[in-house]
Amino acid sequence: EVSWDEAISRASSELNNLKGEILFIASPFSTLEDNYALKKFAKIIFKSDNVFYVPYIDESFEDKLIKKSDKTPNSNGLKLLGINPISEKHIENLKEGKYKIIYLINDDINRIPEGNNFLKKVDINIHHLNIKNAYSDKVTVVFPESTYAEINGTFVNFQNRVQRIKPAVVTLEQERLIGEYSISRLDKFGAPNDSWSHGTRFNARPTWKVLTKIAKSLGYEFNFENSEEVFIELCNSIPGMNGWDYDTIGSMGKTV
């Protein structure tokens, strides 16, 4: 375990010394903001379109009421961003050792088919994770990623309705947007001996925030101060969403 600055420095160094191609793995479990930041990171800094995600489809799960075969919350968001499912071609490239770095956010690398056949051929792994998996101890750099209950952000449901999420759990570096997430009376007036006012605050960050730091260390300014600024920029890149902000989404969401 190291500090955030040390982890960011190590990731930046590995990316700066790149000898080969990078495969970026986006996440259907993450927000529009995090996935957009990853796509921008790949395109602006590395001139790469190698950004894909791993679907999670279970046809037996779907019913005629509310359950869908797609068991992820934001695959429609990835489609909106122009991020496609990983193809057989790219899995073959992995097995052939074409990609020397895998940069993955909020997913289990073992969900990529035939993982055992390519992981040993990848030199560097940089992952953003909020839960450990069977491979995470072997990863070069792991950034602790905030969960959906700790962040501001947006998802797109199966009806293409963009919906807000807001933090319900406090982290060490809690983002507070203007007019939102005020301190409750319980938190404000909790006495030192009140256990409910001293819950664990995890040292985690949203992916977009870490990518902004890494980009800066590599000489690029993303100029994102909060999640809404990421959202506004991504909306201006998508037909039909130009000019949207979090107020546009509101509490009921908005269909795109």
Question: Which residues fall in each region the model found?
Answer:
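Short glycine-rich phosphate-binding loop at a beta-alpha junction
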Residues: 21-26
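A broadly structural signal marking compact, well-ordered functional cores
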Residues: 239-247
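Acidic, Ser/Thr-rich low-complexity intrinsically disordered segments
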Residues: 247-256
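Non-catalytic alpha/beta scaffold blocks inside enzyme catalytic domains
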Residues: 1-10, 14-20, 32-240
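Active-site-proximal loop/turn and secondary-structure-junction residues that shape catalytic pockets
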Residues: 28-30
